[in-house]
From Swiss-Prot:
UniProt-listed CDD domains: KOW_RPL26 (cd06089)
A molecular-function term among this protein's GO annotations: structural constituent of ribosome
Source taxon at top rank: Bacteria
Name assigned to this protein: Large ribosomal subunit protein uL24
Length: 104
């Protein structure tokens, strides 16, 4: 099955502490989660790694968020949108459901 949310898509968070925030998808995980730039930041306690010259400390990084809690952002309408699929010239492409505009 083709993915409705892909890497480098701009998405908007629908639920949770970051509701309403927008960001770019960095990674789509096979477990049904996505990692979005600047969204769902958590603090990790990291041990120093002298071999790699990495200092220890508290590091802030993005955690995964369920794909059902984000929606693709339609720049034309300025709102969250749903994704559909159709065939154009023998290729399967994604489109916004609200205005039938092809994505990328």
């Amino acid at each position: 099955m083709a993915a409705k949310i892909r890497r480098d898509d701009e998405v908007i968070v629908l639920t949770g502490k970051d509701k309403g925030k927008r960001g770019k998808v960095k990674n789509v995980l096979s477990s049904g989660k996505v990692i979005v730039e600047g969204i769902n930041l958590v603090k990790k306690h990291q041990k120093p790694v002298p071999a790699l010259n990495q200092p220890g400390g508290i590091v802030e990084k993005e955690a995964a968020i369920q794909v059902s809690n984000v929606a693709i952002f339609n720049a034309a309408t300025g709102k969250a949108d749903r994704v559909g699929f159709r065939f154009e010239d023998g290729k399967k492409v994604r489109f916004f459901k609200s205005n039938s505009e092809t994505i990328k």
